[in-house]
């Protein structure tokens, strides 16, 4: 998405109204020793703009950066979706923003944390946003808990400090978090660079083909650079030397022509099979076995262009899972449905009602709707009708009947957990990750990392954490408890001053 550059002014600067500015170095005063005057308009405008030049940082995912690129479809997946962006041979401009979840602007890139992987496709049918992470799962499956979760990873209201007790209190009171916390405390919680990590859509989405056939789909972006991670000591050292390590690595790699690539694969579950699969496919804390549904290659994502203006093209980029296109829909995943509202609403607050008019957020195709005016709205509506139906020749949409990207649902309005499937539980997949995926060395490092993160945690929460990990794996849980008790009072890796886990 091209950014409009400001033309250099050969004869000096101007005021905001375009008139010449007399000086950018000297204020207007009454004599050389006198006070400045209120009608020094250029001085006042300069400070007024400076006071308003920032927009609120994202509540989660505040620290990040990104780049533009291209997605090329190399395989034929038209049997799964009619979306033009995924038709054979299609090339689509993209924007990918990486981030950490918990850290604020200015926090180190190499803190242990989940990494955001927010991808926009500028398609012929509109912007398609896939707002994912570098993990295939998440801590929660109900959006009612989301705001509480984010607060538990932020700062205490009195001291303004982050607090390991608060983090573990939330996790252990919500056992569905176990799979993601295991992933986080494992080797992939500290990616060496953004280029050397995978990305995932995490949620389950609905794909619909030209014949109306439906599949539930999971996205996997597999790094062609391989997956490489940092040790606790390496991450701590880099955090103290260069808080922007990941941002710098990405920018400099692209600048010298080393363009990172990811291959996109999907898992496709036939619509009806989603109703009876042994895990609930709409539970964000679970993965879908690749033995049951192997990955299918779609194409390759390449990042090849750095932003020209970080604020205008990265900080002002407004992603939302609600931005879908024909052939791609949402699913009964509660977290996905909650995010579809919350993310767009957050962008309206953070950037403004005109958010979709900014160049980085504008779709490539023409927009025709009945949204008019509002704060900072600058589209000219002229004599267009502002209402429908109308008799003035302005078109509108009026389709009725079932929607392509819908699903069946019935029942009484209720507040309760999702129905359990045959193999559903909160600790099983986390245990499999520890026992069958981690190497012996990775298990040893995992025990050390978790024990370090539990250092200084209040004893009742610590005791609950020991049981939490024993539910994941009895042996690992006991090793964690033994390690914490053995090192009580000592400094151990993985803990910042004050007992804060490196998150």
UniProtKB/Swiss-Prot annotation:
Keyword NADP in annotation: yes
Keywords, sorted A to Z: Cytoplasm, Heme, Hydrogen peroxide, Iron, Metal-binding, NADP, Oxidoreductase, Peroxidase
Cofactor entry: heme; NADPH
Disulphide-bonded residues: none
A UniProt-annotated Pfam family: Catalase-rel
PROSITE patterns: CATALASE_1 (PS00437), CATALASE_2 (PS00438), CATALASE_3 (PS51402)
Gene Ontology MF terms: catalase activity; heme binding; metal ion binding
Region span, Disordered: 1-27
Residues that coordinate or bind heme: 343
Family: Belongs to the catalase family.
Stated name of the protein: Catalase
Species of provenance: Micrococcus luteus (Micrococcus lysodeikticus)
